[in-house]
Amino acid sequence: MASYVICQFRKIMTEIRFKELGLIEYTETYDAMMQLIESQPSFHSIWSLEHYPVFTIGISEKEIIEDKLKTPPFIKTDRGGKTTFHAPGQQVFYFILNMKKLPFPPTELTKKSLETASSALASYDLKHNINARDPGIFIEKQKVASIGMRIKKNYSYHGLSINVETDLDTFNSIKPCGLNVQACNLKDYIDINVDNFKKDLLNNFQRMLTK
């Protein structure tokens, strides 16, 4: 885990801790987020990871029900949005951020996060667009990135997922996030080094939190 002080704003020294979790079960990560929030940290945390195959059901979902015995399992969660899919080859970023120390209103967190991810994609000359109504990033009307967050006790949790080279057959067995669209992978459009891409994203997220 990398941990260091990177900025000062509003006369408050704010630490951002980046943590690489690798391939990890969804429920294990969720429990770790809850434990961190209960500790009321003074710092921001951004976790980079991939999940074992799992469908997660958001609070807006009305059609799909939880079924932990299926393969992959369907797990009910408390994030915003509907149902999405996580699997290896999808880069996930969880934001456990102290809402009192953001350099922008908490209501702008989803918008700022999508714009930040979009700026990283723009460096690859990839044509894409942000959909504010159904939050995410789209390439040729196919969804490549999804976002869903929640705030509890003045902390955000959950976050952003970006399909790099994941299992689209399973993903597209549902309507991604309840939309009549297909999911897509970045590697279908651009040649991308995952480690460099993650580094670019984390640098952009750092700037997002220090403006």
Regions found by a protein language model. Give the residues of each.
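N-terminal lobe of the biotin/lipoate ligase/transferase fold
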Residues: 4-144
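A residue-level signal for conserved active-site and pocket-lining positions in enzyme catalytic cores
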Residues: 33, 48, 186, 197, ...
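Short, conserved beta-strand/beta-arch hydrophobic-aromatic motifs that form part
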Residues: 59-66, 73, 144-164, 168
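A structural signal for short, well-ordered beta-strand segments
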Residues: 93-95, 135, 147-149, 160-164, ...
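Well-ordered alpha/beta subsegment
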Residues: 116, 120-124, 190-209
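Short conserved catalytic/interaction loops centered on acidic-Pro-aromatic/His motifs
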Residues: 128-130, 158, 169-174
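A hydrophobic, small-residue-rich beta->alpha segment in the mid-to-C-terminal subdomain
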Residues: 165-192, 198
